[in-house]
Amino acid sequence: MMKTVTIDLQIASEDQSNLPTLEQFTLWATNAVRAEHFEPEITIRIVDEAESHELNFTYRGKDRPTNVLSFPFECPEEVELPLLGDLVICRQVVEREAQEQGKPLTAHWAHMVVHGSLHLLGYDHIEDDEAVEMESLETEIMTGLGFEDPYSYDEE
């Protein structure tokens, strides 16, 4: 049976309107992680563009805010902790992208949580074959949650 992901939700955004609920974040992360043998924990921090920009520059060398940053927790092998890591999601970027792509806002929030959670599990999209695998898994998870394929909007 799939274990529920415990979410530590931190809201560091001045505007807290139109944010998903803790229950929504939990549902989306749980469906992405699909843990069966442990009860994972993820911190989700909702930030404004200034914090996203600073973190994106510090950790990725990108001089702009981004939609989601993933910080996997690296635990020594001899220590068993259920912490998967942290997701930092920029509210303004998510809202802007949803509007630009013609996506429902809730669907884009869900996609960012699924996408970031998969990064915490070690998935990546740097190489083409990795991107195909990760995007396929994202689509499977999102449609399983009742959303449309998140990449179908990019083609319109």
UniProtKB/Swiss-Prot annotation:
It is found in: Cytoplasm. It is an enzyme of class 3 (hydrolase). Its cofactor is Zn(2+). Transmembrane segments: none annotated. Its EC number is 3.1.-.-. GO terms for cellular component: cytoplasm. The keyword RNA-binding does not apply. Keywords: Cytoplasm, Endonuclease, Hydrolase, Metal-binding, Nuclease, Ribosome biogenesis, rRNA processing, Zinc. Binds 1 zinc ion. GO terms for biological process: rRNA processing. It holds the Pfam family YbeY. PROSITE patterns: UPF0054. NCBIfam families: rRNA maturation RNase YbeY. This is Endoribonuclease YbeY. It comes from Mannheimia succiniciproducens (strain KCTC 0769BP / MBEL55E). The gene is ybeY.
